[in-house]
From Swiss-Prot:
Amino acids binding Zn(2+) 1: 77, 79, 167, 321
Biological function: Catalyzes the reversible cyclization of carbamoyl aspartate to dihydroorotate.
Family membership: Belongs to the metallo-dependent hydrolases superfamily. DHOase family. Class I DHOase subfamily.
Protein name (record): Dihydroorotase
Annotated organism of origin: Wolbachia sp. subsp. Drosophila simulans (strain wRi)
Amino acid sequence: MTQTWNLLQTGQKEGYKIAYTNARIIDPETKLDIKGSLLTEGDKIVDFGESLFSTSGVDETIDCKGLVLMPGLIDIHVHFREPGQEHKETIYTGSKSAAAGGVTTVVCQPNTIPAIDSVVLAKYLKYRALETSHVNVEFYAKITTLEEKLTEMALLKEAGAVGFTDDGMPVMNPMIMRQALLYSSMLGVPIAQHAEDLNLSAGGAINEGKISEELGVKGILSASESVMVNRDILLMKDMENVHYHILHVSSKDSLDAIKRAKDLGLNVTCEVTPHHFTLTEDIVKQHGAIAKMNPPLRTEEDRLAMVEGLKTGVIDCIATDHAPHDRSSKDLPLENAAFGIVGLETMLPLSLELYHSGQMGLLDVLAKLTYKPADIIHIPRGRIQKNLAADLILVDLNHEWEIKTDNFASKSKNSPFDGRKVKGHVVRTVVSGKTIYSQKS
């Protein structure tokens, strides 16, 4: 297998026309699923449909050979470790990993070293992305400073922040959280909470339950998440124009609270990771610290609740929480090892398990990976529409392969999915009309 990458830079050159023919074109938002062709010019989609338009005057023709041509995936939760931990990941290597996984837009979390809590650092991140990324890079900025005061949220939004979070840590102070929610409502951006009450979880390594007891390891109480979710919903329920987003939800009790909030008409959204709807705490016995993440893998009841939440719409989207770590950070006892796993190159096939197993329809699964996350951060992507950005992927839905972490483009290889057999493979990734990743057998 030969893989080729190109930096995004300014995207496809102006006026350059590419015809994608013999494709199964899927757009989850409009429920489009047709055999046809699609035309891009420069960085935009200009035409698509069932009729085979003439390819005369086209600069390049790509025969899709009946494969699925769909919007690029959008992952609103990644850690690219730049600045500060470039030995684990960089924007360059992280975006290579994204491209190989069919992810055309990522949202970087701000818990870098130093954290993205100032306009200077926000501009640095955007500059590095323009210089070294293969895909579109958006970012959250921090809610609080090191002094536990609110950041300059209006200025950070002006500098490009699509929302605010202290991900990696929760906003523990309820007054600070209330102020953040109020300010964000004026700015029209979400507050994204890492929902964890540290008073209930501090010092824990894995889910508190039968496995933590068996291994003699301090656990993280499931209620540490749901207590924080309930607190924040109470704080925002009487505010106008506020958007509260829960990162990497993992417990059934949290979903119950989110459903109640949605039923009341509150603007509450949430995401789930593939590992939380495919794995349980039981695999910690097999994989040890490689299966350590925060929030931790929980029970089968919680896992099934995640699947049900995706099916019913209580869970709005799928996001990876791509958290790269070098080997020395993971080759430690459970209590001392770093939290997190990589996920960009496994998000699509793991999500497609919901389709291949008959639990969800194809368009419903793909919606959680495309326009639904785009809507949470208010960007016009994740769709096939005329005059929108030509962010596209070509996917072989039925290609069977085995996940091998040694083949990941990410600088880090920390994944408990090594050796898992999956279906669904990205053949080509296009961003702003430019092929930035392709794979040939």
